[in-house]
């Protein structure tokens, strides 16, 4: 937000709302055993909006939201990947990443396939919509931690490992890096939700986004190998001349 006063008021309102949850009197409501939440479903849905609002105050993903209007997964995926520079590494960003962790943890703990097939009965449309921003931010933050020249600090390493612990080692090794794996797993989960039409678009977009992240990594590796090739050739010539 360009208006500092408005941003401050929004942050204050969000903080007050979060604190109020602790003193809310629980309503008498029957919660299904299969539900991914323990309290009232309205609180569960409101938390998705809360996390999304917190993230939007830090990262502007308007380009991704605009791309959704055209229902072209390639355009949406390109907007996702091109938003890399908007996701910074900072102590404030770690708070947003914690919100992203809380979002993906629900799916990881209950099972990706289970959530994909039952979310329509337990979740509202707010969850896939709000999860879009959070997962874009999360995958780009993970990518930066994995590829930035600046080494991650202790807090970033702890967060990275906490996220990695949500998935088995075989899955991470299969997709190479955690950033592309999270994008692919989230895309596969959302793609199976058939109740809302927009989730199909989101799922395909995240899968393409995962390919872009892993493809960029392969391009960087090829570039490094190309730079090292002349050095090796010169070394071999020098040895031969000797």
Each predicted region: which residue ranges?
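Intrinsically disordered, low-complexity regulatory regions with latent secondary structure
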Residues: 171-242
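Long, amphipathic alpha-helical regulatory blocks in the mid-to-C-terminal portion
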Residues: 1-181
């Amino acid at each position: 937000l360009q208006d500092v006063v408005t941003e401050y008021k929004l942050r204050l309102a969000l903080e007050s709302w979060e604190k109020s949850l602790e003193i809310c009197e629980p309503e008498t409501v029957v919660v299904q055993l299969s539900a991914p939440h323990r309290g009232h479903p309205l609180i569960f849905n409101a938390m998705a909006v809360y996390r999304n609002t917190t993230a939007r105050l830090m990262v502007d993903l308007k380009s991704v939201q605009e791309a959704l209007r055209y229902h072209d997964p390639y355009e949406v995926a390109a907007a996702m990947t091109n938003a890399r520079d908007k996701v910074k590494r900072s102590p404030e960003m770690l708070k947003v990443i914690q919100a992203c962790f809380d979002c993906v943890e629900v799916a990881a703990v209950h099972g990706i396939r289970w959530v994909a097939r039952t979310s329509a009965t337990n979740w509202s449309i707010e969850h896939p919509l709000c999860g879009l921003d959070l997962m874009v931010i999360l995958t780009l933050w993970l990518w930066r931690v994995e590829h930035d020249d600046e080494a991650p600090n202790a807090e970033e390493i702890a967060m990275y490992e906490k996220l990695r612990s949500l998935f088995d080692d075989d899955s991470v090794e299969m997709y190479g890096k955690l950033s592309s794996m999270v994008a692919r797993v989230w895309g596969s989960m959302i793609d199976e939700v058939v109740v809302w039409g927009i989730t199909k678009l989101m799922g395909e977009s995240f899968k393409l986004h995962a390919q872009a992240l892993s493809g960029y990594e392969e391009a960087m590796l090829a570039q490094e190998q190309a730079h090292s090739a002349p050095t090796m050739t010169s070394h071999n010539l020098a040895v031969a001349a000797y």
